Amino acid sequence: MSLPLPSHMKSVFLGMKVEISTSVPVTRIGFWRKSVDCKESRIGKQPITVPANVAIAMEGQDLKVKGPLGELSITYPREVLVEKQESGFLRVRKAVETRRANQMHGLFRTLTDNMVVGVSKGFEKKLQLVGVGYRATVEGKDLILSLGFSHPVRMAIPDELQVKVEENTKVTVSGRDKSVVGQFAATIRSWRPPEPYKGKGVRYVDEVVRRKEGKAGKKK
């Protein structure tokens, strides 16, 4: 005795197509804005000591500092301000509470402090020439470097810098602008960076050169 099949089973056996419709709930997506936590810069909040022999002049977003070694100036972005306190300190503070202002706060505090130190004490970079026949001399406003090339390297010394050579292999670059001092010293080094096998080249006095063992030294 055969039992009648349900209607939905008949469609399977008879090859009938069954369309199944489903309803998918639509969810509305909302966006939320993340608040930015603008913490005060640890460096930016530190006051800047101004020596007695340094004069400060402020006009709007412009600051000028003048000392025994010369004069430097800087223009601040609108995100930061500089204030001269009665105690004689300079303080850089944020004008607005944004992430960019937080970044500018510490940067311009450092730049301002470098200016004050630069016009009062100055900055210097010392380099050492290592290699047979490597030597340096100063001729007028030019620094002459003999570094194993077919011709000596001649570098014009910027007006705001002083370059001194001792024992033909020790070069001292000094000046009031830290960035200019660093850039000129880096250019000197770039002519012959210290190579890692014998250590020949131009290096900073306090630079540690990582040495590599040559292939001959690896053979047992």
From Swiss-Prot:
Compartments, as annotated in UniProt: Plastid, Chloroplast
> What's the domain of life for this entry?
Eukaryota
Leader peptide range in chain numbering = none
A single GO molecular function, which one? structural constituent of ribosome
What Gene3D superfamilies does the annotation carry?
Answer: Ribosomal protein L6, alpha-beta domain
Pfam families (alphabetical): Ribosomal_L6 (PF00347)
Residues of the transit peptide: 1-38
What positions belong to coiled-coil segments?
none
**One Gene Ontology cellular component:** ribosome
A GO biological process held by the record: translation
What keywords is this UniProt entry annotated with?
Chloroplast, Plastid, Ribonucleoprotein, Ribosomal protein, RNA-binding, rRNA-binding, Transit peptide
Question: Taking the first listed entry, what is the main subcellular location of this protein, grouped into a coarse class?
Answer: plastid
InterPro entries reported in the protein's UniProt record: Ribosomal_uL6-like (IPR000702), Ribosomal_uL6-like_a/b-dom_sf (IPR036789), Ribosomal_uL6_a/b-dom (IPR020040), Ribosomal_uL6_bac-type (IPR019906), Ribosomal_uL6_CS (IPR002358)
Family to which this protein belongs: Belongs to the universal ribosomal protein uL6 family.
Subunit (UniProt): Component of the chloroplast large ribosomal subunit (LSU). Mature 70S chloroplast ribosomes of higher plants consist of a small (30S) and a large (50S) subunit. The 30S small subunit contains 1 molecule of ribosomal RNA (16S rRNA) and 24 different proteins. The 50S large subunit contains 3 rRNA molecules (23S, 5S and 4.5S rRNA) and 33 different proteins.
Q: Which NCBIfam families does the record associate with it?
A: L6_bact (TIGR03654)
Cited function: Component of the chloroplast ribosome (chloro-ribosome), a dedicated translation machinery responsible for the synthesis of chloroplast genome-encoded proteins, including proteins of the transcription and translation machinery and components of the photosynthetic apparatus.
Protein name per UniProt:
Large ribosomal subunit protein uL6c
